Amino acid sequence: MSVSMRLSRGGSKKRPYYKIVVSNSRAPRDGKYLEQVGTYNPLLAKDDENRVRLIEDRVRYWIGVGAQPTDRVARMLDKAGIKERAATNNPQKAEPGKKAKERAEERAEKAREAAEAAAAAAAAPAEEAAAEAPAEAAAEEQTEA
């Protein structure tokens, strides 16, 4: 029999209250359990001491026997200093998907083309101004003479 330590929901609609229980992993979430080892009230403030209450010696016993805490319960146990939770590392989670990468490449390509066009436009008037300047200077010399 695989034993898990998990949350069993109680309370009324929109007012959750959880028991931290040890139960057969195949039993329903709110069904029969072997032992209640704590409570969790998410409606209380995060710094409230009654938000998570654990019976530490029973929790340690069940972990020693082989009960597997769920992720949420493991976080609570880690915060209480009962069982250290291994940090998870998923660097691919932050990586954008294929379509997002394609859109980013298209945007970068459009920006490059716009920069090239702006550089070409800036270079063209400078050449025209250089070409027109001697003609204007010659015209000014003729009017002065």
UniProtKB/Swiss-Prot annotation:
SUPFAM superfamilies (UniProt xref): Ribosomal protein S16
Bias (Low complexity): 116-137
Keyword check for Nucleotide-binding: no
Basic and acidic residues compositional bias, start-end: 95-115
Gene Ontology cellular-component terms listed: cytoplasm; small ribosomal subunit
Pfam families membership: Ribosomal_S16 (PF00886)
InterPro entries: Ribosomal_bS16, Ribosomal_bS16_dom_sf
Positions of region (Disordered): 82-145
Record-annotated disulphide pairs: none
Record bears the keyword Ribonucleoprotein: yes
Molecular-function GO term, any one: structural constituent of ribosome
GO terms of biological process kind: translation
Keywords on record: Ribonucleoprotein, Ribosomal protein
Family: Belongs to the bacterial ribosomal protein bS16 family.
Protein name: Small ribosomal subunit protein bS16
Organism name: Novosphingobium aromaticivorans (strain ATCC 700278 / DSM 12444 / CCUG 56034 / CIP 105152 / NBRC 16084 / F199)
